[in-house]
């Protein structure tokens, strides 16, 4: 489902994004499970709901949520953020040096050369598809092309 922070963005459908995740993660490890919990839920897609579901299913696991620094700056606005930060750690890719509340505990990852946001990447798919292709697993890029996703 679409994030409540991105209500008006043109997005792939929920099922299309799920399919892209399946393509992307199947090559990493057969132990990775891509869940459709949020797609099947009738309630809004809040991260806290998904985290609670995962912890109920896998009570022994430790969860981390990987975000870009742009979302790090918005964390305090996330639904039930106070409860969420007690359940997970946040790993934040440092990108554009957004102002992040110093009270929020983030594990920063620097120097990974991800100087592009997801919105900028979707724009790149239109402006320079060959460059965008170099940034994706071939199966994911082919899926995007075959389904005419993110075209302006």
Predicted regions and their residues:
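Nucleotidyltransferase catalytic core that binds NTPs
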Residues: 1-152
